[in-house]
């Protein structure tokens, strides 16, 4: 089977090509992609910037995706063709020191969908069964494609111990910053502050629940948040 894909061929060289869809191994799932987000990592890859891994072209980027199961390997049991799914782009080895000590994010042998192996900027993507998660019809495909960035932000909320009454300062109003702002509000933060130079983003933040916005090009951020008694080490 042949599919169309956006293939990274080198610095600032992204081409739409027809490429074969890889047959799944026994523990793999072929997903027909419905939506795939464009992450900041994808932008860095396109511009040839150094990032979380050494990207070697040709490669299909994209790691924030949702879709429908098209085909499964012989040993797959948890999903079947037709299931609505989202994918975890990280395939940890489970065998290295970090994996065995609960620090999988430092896995020495991590396989990254869209960074070290082909990803979701394509009609189809192949993942291991353990990386595939079903979701209900109550969730749209475009919403499910946001599962990966939202999960990153949820982890940050936990690490920052955001709770009822917290004061939260978010630096930057890009997609991740806006998600963090909303999640902090859901976690109970009473003061939600965004530092962002772009006016449109500051206005959007106020619509999403920010209690104050700051233009760091015109204001001293530390002075602007002094009324909260927030300290630098708390941000």
Residue ranges and their predicted role:
Residues 228-235:
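Conserved small/polar residues in nucleotide/adenosyl-binding loops
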Residues 2-4:
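Extreme N-terminal starter segment of soluble prokaryotic enzymes
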Residues 93-171:
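NAD(P)H dinucleotide-binding glycine-rich loop of Rossmann-like/cofactor-binding domains
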Residues 22-36, 51-97, 136-139:
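Glycine-rich beta-strand-centered segment in the early N-terminal region that forms part
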